Amino acid sequence: MSNRPAGHVARSTVRPDDETGRPGPVRTYLRTADGVPVEVVYDPGAAVYDPDAPVLVIAHGFTGDVDRPHVRRVAAGLARYGAVVIFSFRGHGRSGGRSTVGDKEVLDLAAALAWARGFGHARVATVGFSMGASVVLRHAALHPGTVDAVAAVSSPARWYYRGTAPMRRLHWLVTRPEGRLVGRYGLRTRIHHRDWDPIPLSPVEAVPLIAPTPLLIVHGDRDGYFPLDHPRMLADASGGHAELWLEPGMGHAEHAADDALVDRIGDWAARRSG
């Protein structure tokens, strides 16, 4: 298979590793199905020496991007278990467009997955955090059979949740003009001003459609954004198919995922994707 990104000229070329012949690190742009340029990074990780290793595609949380230290730390940890692809969602970092806070971002993930498979990996798993977790769940439901395992960390179960102070602040950031200015200039995140129309499939509606693809739901019992009814609702919706890890003392998303947890997620993804 070709390892060139579809629909866009690469900013950097793929160079094989001198010892293994496998591709070295690549940083480039893809174009999504709706024409948005998305920055993406490929790291061969453990796949340099293990041709059977999977590629793990990481979907970051809201306000993240490929250069955020917490995103890079997670990517480095997961690279011990396979190749890694990270990308900046639309409206984040150097990607184009504006964030739709989980709706059109499914197209960003789809482009990254297609590109990741182009490097010749037989297995691919998605690992999403917070907003990115909702995206990997919806993608797996909408495009069955395109991934081999799905891990969702700190995902909401339902839309429009305002039951915690951090989520009330996030809704102000997204829905108010002054909030979007803070997002643009303070958080390097450009947010679309339009409401969802139609309202996308919610994570809890997506989960029953994912089986038989292996599904992992990870959530901290000190998550300040989404309390424990969210992961429990997701697990219940799976009808017993999903694995649920409730992590003692863990907060929210990448910032709260310590190295030991990242290792466990990487090990799970490598085992369950094949």
Positions of PLM-derived features:
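The serine-hydrolase catalytic nucleophile loop
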Residues: F62-A75
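Short beta-strand/loop motif that positions the catalytic acidic residue
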Residues: I210-A211, I217-H219
